[in-house]
Amino acid sequence: MENSQYCQLRKQYIEQQFCRLNHMQRQAVYCINGALLILAGAGSGKTSVLINRISNMVRFGDSYNSDWFPKVDGEYITALESAVKNDEKLDFETEKEISTGAIKPWNILAITFTNKAAAELRQRLSDSLGDTALDVTASTFHSLCMRILRREGEILGYGKAFTVYDTDDQKRVMKEIIKDFGIDEKFVRIKTIMNKISGYKDKLISPAEAEKHANNTLEGIVVKCYGEYQR
């Protein structure tokens, strides 16, 4: 079999695996190299594209766009021909042999906002990839960052047993701080202080650095509370 014939046959097989997607969805799934932005409305199949794109990365890599011809035994080519002819799915090992540039699942991160969405991602990846899906990191932003901090937090001065505060916890602590400092909540609202502290943190400005640039009474109060809050 000639190189071009083989590549066309492989492309046909890959197209069969994603035939339920529409044309634009398939173009996104086949895009492996570089960044890709998908803009679509609710219920348009963005999650399906994400799941299938990851599946394509793990199973076929860049095979759809490649003209690479692997040195495989005739039995694999025969199996590929049969799968295309009968619209069947090859076993994992055969797909691995005919593919090029497949991405290791542990090098893939699928991230979303809610626990529900992350659970759906994991379940649908499992349905598509089986046990291989367990090696794909699919999580929320918060759980991923928590995992990183648990593992690397000592570099930042955090122990492994730190606790993450939610909004109510933050307000409770700040209320205690301004009470200890004798600050009247009628003069400066807790929400104002928290928002300004959040702004400092977003810009990676420490309490000591913020203090250097406090130009008025309000900023002075915020910086004072910021330093205590960090403790």
Residue spans of the language-model regions?
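A basic/glycine-biased coupling hinge at the interface between accessory DNA-binding modules
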Residues: 2-11, 15, 33-35, 55-231
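Acidic active-site catalytic centers that drive phospho-/nucleotidyl reactions
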Residues: 25, 46, 140
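Small-residue (primarily alanine) positions within well-ordered alpha-helices
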Residues: 28, 40-42, 110, 117-118
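Walker A/P-loop
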Residues: 33-53
